[in-house]
Amino acid sequence: ADDLTTLRNGTLDRGITPDCTFNEKDIELHVYSRDKRNGIILKKEILKNYDLFQKSQISHQIAILIHGFLSTGNNENFDAMAKALIEIDNFLVISVDWKKGACNAFASTNDVLGYSQAVGNTRHVGKYVADFTKLLVEQYKVPMSNIRLIGHSLGAHTSGFAGKEVQRLKLGKYKEIIGLDPAGPSFLTNKCPNRLCETDAEYVQAIHTSAILGVYYNVGSVDFYVNYGKSQPGCSEPSCSHTKAVKYLTECIKRECCLIGTPWKSYFSTPKPISQCKRDTCVCVGLNAQSYPAKGSFYVPVEKDAPYCHNEGIKL
């Protein structure tokens, strides 16, 4: 999983400066469907030259997953999410593997320079995702309303850059972007052009789980602050809380129960009790969040163990 905790020390274990430079040819696409549950690896160029997607696949909703710093496209948490998306909603899942640009080869170092390179690479990956989207729309006739992006950490901001680029290409907007604890370091003071922003898709959902490694301001149509968005139950390290955002969404996709967000005006205010929640005031985290009318900031209480719900018997 992603590990921004390496930034805390700011030193190198091996006394070297990592080279996290990469180009488009280094990016792989891990494609999952009910026919290929374990995934196959493709390159964008192959998709351009051959009709590899069947019409039956393309007609489904498509989720494009984008990992973050030090991670890979087939990390165990994304793999679990892909399987849930396939099993529950028959999605076509495409995980963008930009591990070289995310410094995955230097996972044992405590390096600020490597992270800075990875931050710079997010724009290039965002453009790649937008160009890939253009291919889906123009060659495979996929409507933009069928495509959502799900990005964790740096991948959340990468999703935002892709969202900006598809609009520049006049393709329209993605149906949704879900930002899973969008990365904080190097983004804390950034304005919309330089981070994930609510205008990057028709609907932007952000799930905040770590005040140390994630941003602590609103970036979406709805911003869920799980356990006040600071640290998560059962986690002693910031990286654990940072990764919990992925696990929470996966459980929400399974729909065993609903993580309920209750209106929360600011950090200094008291969240509205879940017992007072109604469908027009509160929101369930997950793929159906758009179906609820409320927008803004929401506090989400959780339990320590999966499926994490702490709903006091309330159903929306």
Curated annotation (Swiss-Prot):
Keywords for this protein: Allergen, Cytolysis, Disulfide bond, Hemolysis, Hydrolase, Lipid degradation, Lipid metabolism, Secreted, Signal
Give yes or no: UniProt keyword Cell division.
no
Give me the disulphide-bonded residues: C20-C103, C192-C197, C235-C240, C257-C284, C258-C309, C277-C282
EC number(s) on record? Answer: 3.1.1.32
Q: Which GO terms describe its molecular function?
A: phospholipase A1 activity
Keyword check for Signal, yes or no.
Answer: yes
Q: In which tissues is it expressed?
A: Expressed by the venom gland.
Q: Where is the active site?
A: S153, D181, H242
Q: InterPro entries in the record, alphabetically?
A: AB_hydrolase_fold, Allerg_PlipaseA1, Lipase, Lipase_N, TAG_lipase
Record's Pfam families? Lipase
Positions of the propeptide segment:
5-14
Reactions the enzyme catalyzes: a 1,2-diacyl-sn-glycero-3-phosphocholine + H2O = a 2-acyl-sn-glycero-3-phosphocholine + a fatty acid + H(+)
* Cross-referenced Gene3D superfamilies: alpha/beta hydrolase
Signal sequence, start to end: 1-4
Q: Which family, according to UniProt?
A: Belongs to the AB hydrolase superfamily. Lipase family.
Which purpose does this protein serve, as stated in its record?
Answer: Catalyzes the hydrolysis of phosphatidylcholine with phospholipase A1 activity. May act as an allergen and induce hemolytic activity.
- The name on file for this protein is Phospholipase A1 2
- The source organism is Polistes dominula
Lineage per the UniProt record:
Eukaryota, Metazoa, Ecdysozoa, Arthropoda, Hexapoda
